[in-house]
UniProtKB/Swiss-Prot annotation:
GO terms for cellular component: apoplast; extracellular region; plant-type vacuole; plasma membrane. Its main location: secreted. Oligomer (believed to be a pentamer but probably hexamer). InterPro entries: Cupin_1, Germin, Germin_Mn-BS, RmlC-like_jellyroll, RmlC_Cupin_sf. The gene is GLP9. One of its GO terms (molecular function) is manganese ion binding. Residues 1-24 form the signal peptide. This is Germin-like protein subfamily 1 member 8. It comes from Arabidopsis thaliana. Transmembrane segments: none annotated.
C-alpha cells in the first residue's frame, strides 16, 4: 500500500471518528436519572451538572409548580417566558427535554430568536398567534408562517430563527417543549445591537445597509 493510500485511510478514519461528535446533541442517559445539583459533594459530573446521590433523591427533585401563574408582560416586547429547565428542575438533567410557558400581552411578541441546542414544539392555550420560522441561507431564507388558535401546534426546527406574535386584543398563552435540558436562547435584536461591548457600528451599517447613525441609535436602545 502506498503512502498516499495510507494517508487517505488515516484521514477517512479520523473523519469517521469525529462525525458522531459533530451530529450529537444531548447525550442519552446511561442511568435512570441524574438529578442536577450545583455542588460536587457526593456527586458525579454528568452533562454539565453534578448528579445528586440517588439515595437522597425524592419526588420533589422531579417537580415544578407555578406554570399556572401568568408572567409579567409589562415590557418593551410585551411577552414573558417562564422557563422550566435543568437550572430550576434538577431532575431534567440528562433527560434531553425542557418546557416553557409564554405569556403575550395584546399585540405582544416573543421576538425573533433561536435555540442553538433544541427543536421546539408549541401549543396555543389561549388567544391567537402568528408564528413562523425562517430557513437557512442554503434554503433561500424562506419564511414558514401560520396563524394558530387554541389547541393548534407548530414546530420550530433546531437552530432556526423563529417568532410568535399575538394577533388578538386580549392576552395569549402558549406552552412549548424543547428537545434539550437547557436549550439556550439567542434573541436576534438584543444580540446584534446589544452586545457587550458594542459591535463596530460600521460593520452593522454595512451588513444591514443602514446609516451609521441609525445603527448607533439602535445600539443605544439595547
Amino acid at each position: 500500500m502506498t503512502i498516499k493510500s495510507l494517508s487517505f485511510l488515516a484521514a477517512l478514519s479520523l473523519f469517521a471518528l469525529t462525525l458522531p461528535l459533530v451530529i450529537a446533541s444531548d447525550p442519552s442517559p446511561l442511568q435512570d436519572f441524574c438529578v442536577g445539583v450545583n455542588t460536587p459533594a457526593d456527586g458525579v459530573f454528568v452533562n454539565g451538572k453534578f448528579c445528586k446521590d440517588p439515595r437522597i433523591v425524592f419526588a420533589d427533585d422531579f417537580f415544578f409548580s407555578s406554570l399556572n401563574r401568568p408572567g409579567n408582560t409589562n415590557n418593551a416586547v410585551g411577552s414573558n417566558v417562564t422557563t422550566v429547565n435543568v437550572n430550576n428542575l434538577g431532575g431534567l438533567n440528562t433527560l434531553g427535554i425542557s418546557l416553557v410557558r409564554i405569556d403575550y400581552a395584546p399585540n405582544g411578541q416573543n421576538p425573533p430568536h433561536t435555540h442553538p441546542r433544541a427543536t421546539e414544539i408549541l401549543v396555543v392555550q389561549q388567544g391567537t398567534l402568528l408564528v413562523g420560522f425562517i430557513s437557512s441561507n442554503q434554503d433561500g431564507n424562506r419564511l414558514f408562517a401560520k396563524t394558530l388558535n387554541v389547541g393548534d401546534v407548530f414546530v420550530f426546527p433546531e437552530g432556526l430563527i423563529h417568532f410568535q406574535f399575538n394577533l388578538g386584543g386580549t392576552p395569549a398563552v402558549a406552552i412549548a417543549a424543547l428537545s434539550s435540558q437547557n436549550a439556550g436562547v439567542i434573541t436576534i435584536a438584543n444580540t446584534i445591537f446589544g452586545s457587550k461591548p458594542d459591535v463596530d457600528p460600521n460593520v452593522l451599517a454595512r451588513a444591514f445597509q443602514m446609516d451609521v447613525n441609525a445603527v448607533r441609535n439602535l445600539q443605544a436602545r439595547f
